[in-house]
Amino acid sequence: MTNYKRIGHIAIRAKDIDASIAFYRDLLGMEEAFRMYNEAGRLSTIYVCLAPGQFIEIFPDGLVERKIDTDTIGYSHLCIEVEDAAKTLETLRAGGLLVDRELQTGLSRCRMFWTHDPDGNRIEFMELTPESLQAQAIKRLEAL
């Protein structure tokens, strides 16, 4: 077994850092953890906290747009696990969240809905139901 603890952060480069912070901090409700500045005093990175010890690292000044869809090779999406997908959807939608795919039960029997950030990065919100394959795998792996 490895000594991995968790995914510490994901990193994205934003075209408009203010729009990204408004999305992740103000709309999704993540706490801004800290900002880093380079030697010239210019903003280089903003960290927002998703959950204890888990961050999204946002870099400003993205210049090159890329096609982001289900067929793109490489990074596909961020999945945020939530306690209650329906309640989360209702709360975020009331705050102005645009939903790409409505709440549904996936092949793995989890409940999920989808959105995207200001740069088009896909985000899945997922609730693990007791019968979901993920919840079953977690139980099995914790028993090892």
Can you annotate each of these PLM segments?
Residues 1-3, 6-15, 45-50, 66-144, ...:
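Vicinal oxygen chelate
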Residues 2, 13-55:
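Core segments of cupin and vicinal oxygen chelate
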Residues 33-35, 43, 63-68, 101, ...:
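A short, acidic/glycine-rich surface segment
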Residues 57-59, 124:
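Conserved beta-strand in the GNAT
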